[in-house]
Regions:
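Ser/Thr/Asn(+Pro)-rich, low-complexity disordered segments
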Residues: 1-183, 187, 213-222, 314-455
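Charged/polar, low-hydrophobicity segments characteristic of intrinsically disordered regions
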Residues: 132-145, 168-180, 223-240, 271-298
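Short alpha-helical patches at coil-to-helix transitions and adjacent helical residues
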Residues: 138, 185, 189, 240-247
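Short glycine/serine- and small hydrophobic-enriched flexible loop segments
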Residues: 143-147, 193-198, 248-256
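Active-site cradle of extracellular carbohydrate-active enzymes
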Residues: 179-228, 232
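Internal, well-ordered domain-core segments that constitute the primary functional module
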Residues: 212-279
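Extended amphipathic alpha-helical segments with heptad-repeat/coiled-coil character used for oligomerization
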Residues: 251, 259, 263-330
Length: 455
């Protein structure tokens, strides 16, 4: 068994876990302060692992003075940046890390203790290969370039990578990047807007645009995103995983766009933080969410608590995937009155996306729920297109959604097999044939439902 579960720092994740022998023992005395235990059973060539969660060991983490009092906003902000800077590279599992937030935090301190030049080159390779979530890296890279000089070989490498990046799904390329979600969309849009502005006279071959054209393309997309959120609210509302990502993208828009767009992005950011503050109850965020993960079981341990701790240093903190490293170089001001929203009694409801969220909280309890679809029901208009190019990306293979797909359009449910993932008896030729059949079927159903031809 081992206590290793998830390391925030990829440098530590690469170190082999320490395994303790339990063979022949009827009971084991587990260490305090270790909330996760992974047990491994080996029989011949078979290996079975299971992670056990020790709920009583999962407790809030506070950053307070020795006398128990809270640090000031500015003091706490520096502590947050220091925690992020001390992590070499945010772990994305056991194979690689995303270092840009950590590098930004270290630049804030003029900290040269880690090999950030090597990390930058590794990061540029991930962007060039278009890893899923490489838009996160690109967004951070743009922030870096706006604040810190680069010269020589690094400057040339960055330019090559940025010119050849794929900034939206209708551009040339096939990769594992996810474009579809609310946070990813804004990341790509603002990256296109800013990258084009940085190289106005250069040609971006995947976009088939000059930098000046790409800037206008991205700017238009950012405006559409802001229009949508201002009118309908967030679709990933109150998501304690993704609000940190959206925060980072929004402050890039705040910091690196023209004044009118910057002002609108700041207002949307204010709204997002106000919603989270309203649903903060005592030591955690208690809310229905547009996208949710298992961490919701522990409200004090959710990613967005990094944002709430920034606002109110008395609250527990989390690492929040290091996203607040972006804030170290931002001029976005945290709005007044958010701590009051956290602490005051309230009984209210509000709409966001396709949901109406209800909340009642006081000193004794917090109750919250969601109605979806909400009343009144409103939905944006589809683009008036007759034809749309669709790029189906590799990420779906990893999510298994292209092994068994359920299409529920016009009351029809079609369950189909579209790849060989986990089905080794199918030959590649047969799997490809099935995949083509699926695409034709999907195209016909899509055309019937929308009047659009799917190419």
């Amino acid at each position: 068994y081992t206590y290793r579960y998830h390391e925030e720092d990829f440098a530590k994740a690469k170190i082999p876990a320490v395994w303790y022998q339990a063979e022949g023992k009827n009971e084991i005395l587990l260490e305090n302060g270790q909330p996760y235990v992974t047990v491994k059973v080996v029989s011949g060539k078979l290996e079975l692992k299971r992670v056990f969660e020790r709920t009583e060991q999962l407790v809030p983490k506070y950053a307070l003075r020795e006398d128990g009092s809270a640090f000031s906003f500015e003091e706490n902000k520096e502590l947050i940046f220091r925690r992020i800077a001390d992590v070499m590279s945010e772990s994305r599992g056991e194979k690689f890390g995303f270092p840009i937030s950590n590098i930004l935090a270290r630049k804030h301190f003029n900290d040269n203790s880690m090999d950030d030049e090597r990390l930058m080159y590794e990061m540029l390779e991930m962007i060039e290969e278009r890893y899923d979530c490489s838009d996160f890296l690109m967004c951070g890279l743009i922030r870096y370039l706006h604040n810190y000089p680069v010269e020589g070989a690094m400057k040339k490498r960055i330019k090559d990578v940025m010119l050849n990046y794929r900034y939206w799904m209708d551009m040339d390329g096939f990769d594992g990047m996810c474009f579809w979600s609310e946070n990813h969309a804004l990341m790509f849009y603002t990256c296109a807007m800013n990258a084009g502005e940085m190289y106005p006279d250069e040609y971006f071959p995947r976009a088939k645009m000059t930098g000046r054209e790409l800037h206008l393309y991205g700017r238009n997309k950012v405006l559409q995103w802001l229009d949508d959120v201002e009118e309908y609210g967030f679709e990933e509302f109150l998501s304690t995983v993704y609000m940190c990502v959206t925060f980072a993208a929004l402050i890039n828009v705040v910091d690196y766009s023209e004044p009118e767009i910057s002002k609108r992005a700041a207002a949307v950011t204010d709204k997002m933080l106000s919603m989270l503050a309203l649903h903060t109850y005592k030591t955690g965020i208690v809310a229905p969410m547009g996208r949710v993960y298992r961490s919701v079981l522990y409200p004090f341990d959710q990613g967005a608590m990094a944002l709430m701790n920034l606002i109110n240093p008395k609250l527990p903190y989390t690492f929040g995937e290091g996203w607040l490293g972006f804030y170290a170089s931002s001029h976005y001001p945290i709005p007044e009155g958010l701590v009051k929203l956290m602490e005051d009694d309230v009984e209210t409801n509000h709409t966001t996306g396709n949901a109406r969220v209800y909340l009642e909280k006081n000193d004794d309890y917090c109750l919250t729920s969601v109605a979806s679809p909400r009343e009144p029901f409103t939905r944006w208009e589809n683009e008036p297109l007759r034809k749309m190019w669709i790029s189906r990306h590799i990420t779906l293979r990893n999510h298994l959604t292209n092994v068994f797909m359920a299409l529920h359009i016009l009351g029809q449910v079609h369950t189909v097999i579209s790849s060989t993932c986990g089905m080794q008896r199918l030959t590649a030729k047969r799997a490809f044939s099935l995949h083509i059949q699926v695409l034709h079927q999907r195209r016909a159903i899509c055309a019937q439902a929308t009047g659009m031809e799917m190419v």
